[in-house]
Amino acid sequence: MNLLCGNIKTLYFKYLSAAFGSALISSIYGIVDMAMVGQYQGPDGTAALAVVAPVWNVIYSLGLLMGIGGSVIFSTKRGSGMSGDGENDQYFTAAVIGSVILAALAWIGLILFERPLLMFFGADETLLALAQRYMIPVKVVFPLFLFNQMLAAFLRNDGAPALATLGVLSGGIFNVFGDWFFVFPCDMGVYGAGLATALGSTVSFLVMLTHFASRKNTLRLVKPKRLARKSRLTKRGYRRIIVVEF
């Protein structure tokens, strides 16, 4: 798929369907999470998930900050013919390094300050117990939620929008059926919903990683140069954070 010479209409609808599909399945499994927990735990269960919602906003926003910001500049450099000097790979590398740093900080922050954060987001003693139980499996794979956002953005700009959608779709489908299986047949309640979410994110991550074994892959990690200057990728990504948060 050639972004420079391909048919504009075909390219537009290919990328539109991929982006729409990803957003749709993300919305669906968020609703299913709420429905399953609500049926099992009652109103307190859905309220506990609402308390956790800001945590998702933060980690998704950080992933978009690196992914959207980095992938836009990556494509710009490649489209301008600068891919030969490896400048586009520099921005992919910078985005990966930035993602690792932000994921580590968010992970540590969540582990150390989980209780005060959830209380700040509105949990009382009853909701706090449920929210913390939901977060037990989620905390294990918490960085993957950031990496998935970053990888999906780069895959779409590396000519693999279908794989990015497949990654989100496969994780979402696993989450939907995992919610039912872990919550009801396994009688895990809100913990089961968290487990399904954690495993679904892992499935998405593994599916998107297959891109790096593909012949179509042009994403390369290189030795970073003038890394501080590459931080301008955050200027391209912060607008997306505003959309997600507000």
List each language-model region with its residue ranges.
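Hydrophobic transmembrane alpha-helices of multi-pass small-molecule transporters
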Residues: 58-61, 175-179, 205-209
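Membrane-helix interface/capping residues of multi-pass secondary transporters
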Residues: 34, 43-46, 114, 161, ...
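Transmembrane helix-bundle signature of multi-pass secondary active exporters and lipid flippases
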Residues: 19-72, 138-145, 236-246
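Helix-loop interface residues and adjacent transmembrane-helix termini in multi-pass membrane transporters
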Residues: 28-31, 40-43, 77, 157-158, ...
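Small-residue-rich hydrophobic transmembrane alpha-helices
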Residues: 46-108, 145-164
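Hydrophobic/aromatic residues in alpha-helical transmembrane segments
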Residues: 33, 70, 113-114, 151, ...
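Alpha-helical transmembrane segments of multi-pass membrane transporters/permeases
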Residues: 99, 154-180, 191-198
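Short alpha-helical transmembrane segments in multi-pass integral membrane proteins
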Residues: 1-19, 74-143, 185-246
